Structure formats: C-alpha cells, structure tokens
Amino acid sequence: LTHEYKDAPEMRQLMREYQDQLRDIGLNGLGLLPPIPHSSGHKFVGTETCGKCHKTAFEIWEGTPHAHATASIVSPPEDPGYVARHFDPECISCHVTGWNPQEYYPYASGYLSLEQSGHLTGNGCENCHGPGAEHSAAEEEGSNISEEARIALRNAMKLPLEKAREKCMTCHDLDNSPDFHEPD
C-alpha cells in the first residue's frame, strides 16, 4: 500500500513482533551467508574516513537522505509509532554501508549492527565507489605505496556515469522505490 493509507494497529503489532524476532535471532541465526569478502578484496572504512580528504563531497552527502538512511529505519522523526527495521536484512541491505543490496548479506568488514559497526551507518560512499580501506591508506602521509599503485587505487574508486544508474537501481528498484526517478 502507499503512504496515503494508515497502518492498522494490528499490523504494526505483528510487524513489531516480527522485528523483535529478527533482533533476537540475529544475523547469524537467520541462515544468511556469512559475511564474504567484497569482490574487490578491499575492506570498508566508512564515510567519515572518505570525508577526511573529500570534504566537499562529504558535506554534500551529510545533507542527503543517504546520510540518514540508517536513522530512517531505526526511528524516523515524523512517525512516533514506527516499527524499527534495523534488524531486517531486506532493509539493512540498502540503509547501511557494506551489504549486497540484492542478495541481503553483509560483506566482510561491512555493517553488522549499530553497536559493532556504527561507522558504517548511512548509505555511504563505499556502497557505490567500493570499499575504501586500501585507497585511504595509500593516501596517508608516509605510506610506502608507489605513485603508480596509488593512481590505480584512485581509478578503481571512480564511478563512471554509465555505471551510476546500475548502482542506484540496486536499491532504488520497483520493489523498494517505485517513485524513484533518475535526475535529468
């Protein structure tokens, strides 16, 4: 249903019970794949790390719904009766950093919980650009990496425009974002 229809209290209660079960079972108990390495072989560091160098991009991101994606499933301010969904893999996969959004499993070093990996809240830079641990380490003063390797890591983080739509659609699909329209 659309947002024009109010949730029935009985359905909210069922959803609350379901979310409580997900919390109690935990990700391991759900039979999900164990966290697997990202196809790049790199690890996630979180958007704050990206923002140390990419200050303007970070400031813009902070003002977007992507920055508040996790908060929106924990407790959206406009709905005090909302049922938190931050234990639900189908929600987590697009509302945090470091999950496969189509197959609902975390990558190794990806988000696991607010307590364990709070630095990976929000739909961060790395969901589209790839895990940034090696790139950010290479950019640190005193790193022992060659300039050629540093440039290769930079290039690997670039998201060509033609690939951006594909990345967007992994979360903004018809099931989750039927009203999503690409900017002109």
Model segments located where?
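Non-transmembrane alpha-helical segments in soluble domains
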Residues: 126, 168-169
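Domain-level detector of nuclease and nuclease-like folds
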Residues: 161-166, 173-176
